Amino acid sequence: MVQTNSFSKGLAKMNLIILNGRVVDPTQNINKKINIEIKNGKVNNYFTGQPKKNINPDKYEIINAKNMIISPGFIDLHVHLRDPGLVHKENIKTGSDSAASGGFTSIACMPNTLPPNDNPKITKYILKTAEKDSKINIFPIGAITKNQQGNELAKIKENIKSGCIAISDDGFPVVNSKLLYEAMLISKKIGVPVISHCEECSLSKDGVINEGKYSKKYDLPGIPNSSEELGVLRDIFIAEYTLSLIHI
């Protein structure tokens, strides 16, 4: 997996003592008030009371985390950074700064850029920009189809080799089942997941609101649940048939 910026390099130099916080770490089955020693960017010790005598406080930054929760960094697998091409909506710096402020240390960005991330040139641009502008790890997701238009496959192998961790057409379903089948065969061989937008557009295309009480009350075209359910069924069947990884 490609790490896209200097975030890990900064962590490697970090020495911290975090006191008086509540640690929530499911990987260690910890959910209690406890102190943490971080040495060279890694958790070295959990302890109660005062730091050990052999810890030189001059070499550590001391943080009082009273009334705070401490946890491993969060991961968001579906982020819209919109860079390149749509930076009036978001860019790599603003998006990663916002993520860091919310406790997210790794994010995966969808290919809904302009042009869409369907080739190595765009993937490399994202990684290079993230190296310069991001405080956190950014992992690009490449498009399944060229321009996300569903007509032909994107450069999936090349994009994964350049640093993409998964493939997706983001908010567009791959309507052509044969194309999705071929994409899943490629993704299986490479070992990356397909992140699927599940929708049967023939049922949802005229809808503006979920079909139900309020669509009827306000006489608005509704989107039935079955439009998503049919999409999920199809994608699961293709994933089962190809034995590939799918994230729905």
Region locations from a protein language model:
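Active-site metal-binding motif and surrounding structural segment of the metallo-beta-lactamase
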Residues: 52-70
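Active-site gating/metal-coordination segments in enzymes
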Residues: 132, 139-142, 147-183
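Alpha-helix-loop-beta-strand connector modules within alpha/beta enzyme cores
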Residues: 120-136, 186-196
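Hydrophobic faces of well-ordered beta-strands that scaffold small-molecule active sites
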Residues: 73-79, 107, 138-142, 167-168, ...
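Metal-associated gating/positioning segment near the N- to mid-region
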Residues: 68-130
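Active-site gating loops and adjacent loop-to-helix segments of metal-dependent hydrolytic enzymes
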Residues: 102-104, 128-137, 200-242
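N-terminal metal-binding scaffold of metallo-dependent hydrolase/deaminase domains
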Residues: 1-56
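Conserved small/polar residues in nucleotide/adenosyl-binding loops
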Residues: 247-248
